[in-house]
A protein has these predicted regions:
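Bacterial N-terminal signal peptides
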Residues: 7-16
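A residue-level marker of the well-folded mature domains of exported/periplasmic proteins
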Residues: 13, 21-330
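Intrinsically disordered and other compositionally biased segments
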Residues: 6-7, 21
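Positively charged n-region of N-terminal signal peptides that target proteins for export
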Residues: 1-4
């Protein structure tokens, strides 16, 4: 039987008007295109709001491009199109960091600045930015799921893709924390790269629940994973027996969360990520120095490691916080 996880207000600052450094407007107008993993899903729809709204605020012609499938080849084609259009800045949320290296190099050779998100140390990018600390992200998810599982039993791990660095780093951190602190817990099989698809996640969860009758938990780093897993668990009426934690879009997950088919998780706010794309691009185009200790817009004070801009702005997806995010359109 599940153990209840105490609600945590960590990250509630996302709902308040915290005093962040006011981003400077673009000194000269420029054009920016942001290529996301896949278009038409809630997470990236909300990110698009942040991109377009911040663009208008800072005087930047900023827009989002969403491939029809989460296929790296489609991202390559979208980036090639932006190069042909001679945009000033290209932003990317990569599906496969390695596959994008050649086309990002071509962009830089054409004089285009390149910014990525969720791809730390991305080769051929000027900057990558992160809104969540990797070790904390993994540890927080595992602490909560371990509490739910009674610190013992079998669990499975979903990620958005086996080739996206960040979600796999989160998974690595969670698994390492489990091995160090919860020896009676055991991960079944290897991680599954299904969490960008509700259908694939639901099918995989069903397969796992059939194969492992005593499965007690599913963790997912990828916004569609908890939804698919939660639906599978709800349909099997295992809400009270199986714990699901991970990154999900509040509007998609709130009903499953209230029913106990999803139990919680942590996310960054994709609207903030969209805003930060434009804020970092504007700082670069204005010639501002990006270094540890400075503040950049909604990131607040940053740390820099190589070409990665680091911050930590999580929100806990308990019922209370998730409802608030739904109210603001996420």
């Amino acid at each position: 039987m599940k153990k209840l996880v105490l609600p945590c207000l960590m990250g509630a600052a996302l709902f308040s008007n915290m005093a962040m450094a006011e981003s400077q407007k673009a000194q000269k107008p420029f054009t920016m295109g942001v290529v996301v993993k896949v278009g038409g899903i809630p997470w990236f729809n909300v990110m698009e709001q942040g991109i377009t709204e911040e663009g208008k605020k800072l005087g930047v012609n900023a827009f989002q491009v969403g491939p029809t499938t989460a296929d790296p080849a489609e991202q390559v084609r979208a980036i090639e199109d932006l190069i042909a259009k001679k945009v000033d800045v290209i932003g990317v949320v990569p599906n496969d960091a390695k596959v994008l290296e050649p086309v990002l190099k071509r962009a830089q050779e054409a004089g285009i600045k390149v910014i990525t998100h969720e791809s730390p140390d991305q080769k051929n990018a000027d900057w990558d930015f992160e809104l969540l600390d990797t070790q904390s992200m993994g540890a927080n998810h595992m602490k909560d799921m371990a509490a739910c599982m009674g610190e013992e039993g079998k669990y499975a791990m979903f990620v958005g893709s086996l080739t996206v660095p960040l979600v796999n780093e989160w998974a690595d951190a969670a698994i390492a924390y489990q091995k160090a602190h919860y020896p009676k817990m055991q991960m079944v099989d290897d991680r599954f790269g299904v969490a960008e698809s509700v259908d694939d996640s639901m099918r995989t969860a069903n397969d796992l629940l059939s194969k492992h009758k005593d499965l007690k938990g599913i963790m997912s780093f990828g916004s569609q994973g908890p939804i698919g897993a939660g639906r599978a668990i709800d349909k099997r009426r295992k809400n009270a027996e199986t714990c699901v934690f991970g990154t999900f879009t509040p509007g998609q997950g709130i009903k499953l969360l209230e029913k106990g088919a999803i139990d919680g998780g942590y996310i960054s706010n994709p609207k903030v990520a969209g805003q930060v794309f434009v804020q970092v691009a504007t700082a670069m185009m204005n010639g501002e120095e990006i270094k540890t200790g400075v503040s950049i817009g909604d990131m607040g004070e940053i740390k820099v490691s190589g070409n990665t801009i680091l911050s930590d702005n999580p929100v806990n997806l308990n019922v209370e916080n998730t409802k608030k995010l739904v109210e603001v359109g996420l």
